[in-house]
Amino acid sequence: MLSRESSTLIARYRFAISEYSSTEDHIDEVFRRINSNGKILSKQELRSAGCVSNFSELVRKISTIIRGDTTHSDIMGLNKIHNISICNDGLDYGINIDNHFYIRNHIISRPSIRDSDDEELVANILGYIFLDDKPTSGSTSLDTFYGEGSTSHAIHTRTQLENYIQTNGADKIVNNYLFVYEMIQKLFDANNLNFRSHILGNASSSQECPRYYQAVFLALYELIINENMQLDDEQKFIAQLGD
């Protein structure tokens, strides 16, 4: 227990505080952008900061599992934060993604994952699955999913996303998504194939191909989850996917 003198010193400590007036939305935007090390936040980081919808939580949960954070929890002590960070080369803590399926197959690069582009991929896929009016993939749709826009269309889109989750259940959605993800991973790993090279050809110099992965994922999701079909001949399927 602190002495009375120490407690008094702490209580009398003066903090440097700046005050200014602004609108509530502007203040929220300022706090969304604050970070401890001056890093410029990516578009997806800005979208998810402060967004508490069921959709954003579902995207975060699926992305976290796929990224490899098996110790994920909504509540964590500050001394354990480094354990859920993507580690830098040579460090013995955090999540090592150098051998991740996305990176090995040039679906998403390591820097892009650090910018949460893997969350964008999940959000685009879920948005397409959930919505009757199929959205295009890109910033405009993602901004709408995460709360931007007050038009009737934007509000209806977010309502439909939330209703889909409540109707089908978050756990079921997560399990279905992971089932398809793991199926694609096993198909390419078991056949010693690289996703980018197999889909785009060996001559491709593209460092990433998230949209092609999204197309394959959604096709399998439709057949396996929605139509309850099974993959009978893996080799023929793989051949059909080839360039």
Predicted regions and their residues:
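C-terminal subdomains that position terminal phosphate/3'-OH groups for nucleotidyl transfer/ligation
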Residues: 119-243
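Basic- and aromatic-enriched surface patches that contact anionic nucleotides/nucleic acids
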Residues: 1-137
